A protein has these predicted regions:
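Terminal, low-structured helical/coil segments at or just beyond the last alpha-helical repeat
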Residues: 2, 9-19, 95-136
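Structural signature of tandem alpha-helical TPR/SEL1-like repeats
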Residues: 31-43, 66-78, 100-112, 117
């Protein structure tokens, strides 16, 4: 079945990889310390879907891992623009700012991450209470 083909075999047979396959390839390459190739794979995933959150997260982390903090910050900002309620995106961007010495920016984004975390926790507590009351 064509859906069962590995990404490399699919390419050899002329089929384009999906964004998920490019993302998975990027993860494998990053695990092998092939950062340039991982970056290229994530960029191919993002060419198909510029707001693909998993690829944006991964690309930002690869850039940060090789001290390309300007690039990590730019991708982190793109991720937040695409997913403004993403707590992890805010936390990561705060870390990138901090590592670059941009403390005021790090604190501002970090505060937003904490606020999003509190909102998530409140919503989880509300849902737990609702589930409990429905059982009774």
């Amino acid at each position: 079945m064509p859906g069962d083909l590995s990404p490399a075999l699919r390419l050899l047979q002329g089929g384009e990889m999906t964004k998920e396959q490019y993302y998975a390839e990027g993860m494998e390459l990053f695990a092998q310390d092939k950062t340039d190739e991982a970056i290229a794979a994530y960029q191919k995933a993002l060419a198909q879907d510029p707001n693909y959150a998993d690829a944006l997260h991964a690309l930002a982390m690869v850039y940060a891992s090789v001290e390309k903090l300007d690039e990590a910050i730019e991708v982190g900002q793109r991720l937040i623009k695409a997913n403004p309620e993403d707590e992890l995106a805010h936390t990561s961007l705060s870390i990138f700012y901090q590592r670059k010495g941009m403390i005021a920016e790090a604190e501002k984004i970090g505060a937003k991450a904490r606020t999003l975390g509190w909102k998530r926790e409140l919503e989880e507590m509300k849902q737990a209470k609702q589930s409990e009351s429905e059982k009774n």
